[in-house]
Amino acid sequence: MDLLLLLFSAIWYILPAYVANAVPCILGGGKPVDFGKTFFDGNRIIGNGVTYRGTFFGILFGIITGILQHFIVILYMGPETVFDYGLFGYIILSFLLASGTLFGDMLGSFIKRRFKLNQGQSAPILDQITFIVFALLFAYPFYPLATNSIVLLLVISPIIHFSSNIIAYKLHLKKVWW
């Protein structure tokens, strides 16, 4: 497969996860999913950075992205394309990707708290990769992706994540650049 087509198809597949990962930074806040509770080690279970509002809007906008993808496929690519999962398929795929993304983010926060890292402290690789790994784990059993696409996503996602964090920091949407 041509590298450019491979890149496009991999990003097209994972786009709802990228959106779901970014939206809580903009629309999050409010009640944390751990209700402010501490784990048996005395540290917060997850922390203030993962909220119900951010989780809800992350999943919602991930699904909206999937719905938009469906209509883009129909309008510009035609129904006889590799990207045509159908409307219901896009809704399910985007829900799985968005849910996996936010679960991965929660798990990453949980692990960081176990290592006594506060919200906003950097945990290289963990910060950049858990969301994509869990997005793929949630979606892959129902919507498999070629191995070369998975490898490509595992390589480019940390770069995209890092770059988008710098942009969010410059736009004053994040307090730290990582």
Curated annotation (Swiss-Prot):
UniProt cross-references to NCBIfam families, sorted A to Z: PRK04032.1 (NF003114)
Organism: Methanococcus maripaludis (strain C6 / ATCC BAA-1332)
A Pfam family that the UniProt record links to this protein: CarS-like
Domain of life according to the entry: Archaea
Phylogenetic lineage: Archaea, Methanobacteriati, Methanobacteriota, Methanomada group, Methanococci
Keyword Zinc-finger: no
Keywords: Cell membrane, Lipid biosynthesis, Lipid metabolism, Magnesium, Membrane, Phospholipid biosynthesis, Phospholipid metabolism, Transferase, Transmembrane, Transmembrane helix
Name of the protein this chain belongs to: CDP-archaeol synthase
Record's GO cellular component terms: plasma membrane
Family statement drawn from the similarity comment of this UniProt entry: Belongs to the CDP-archaeol synthase family.
Pathway: Membrane lipid metabolism; glycerophospholipid metabolism
Cited HAMAP family: CDP_archaeol_synth
A single GO molecular function term of this UniProt record: CDP-2,3-bis-(O-geranylgeranyl)-sn-glycerol synthase activity
The keyword Lipid biosynthesis belongs to this UniProt entry's keyword annotation: yes
Cofactor entry: Mg(2+)
Chief location category: membrane
GO biological process: glycerophospholipid biosynthetic process
Transmembrane portions of the chain: 3-23, 56-76, 87-107, 123-145, 150-169
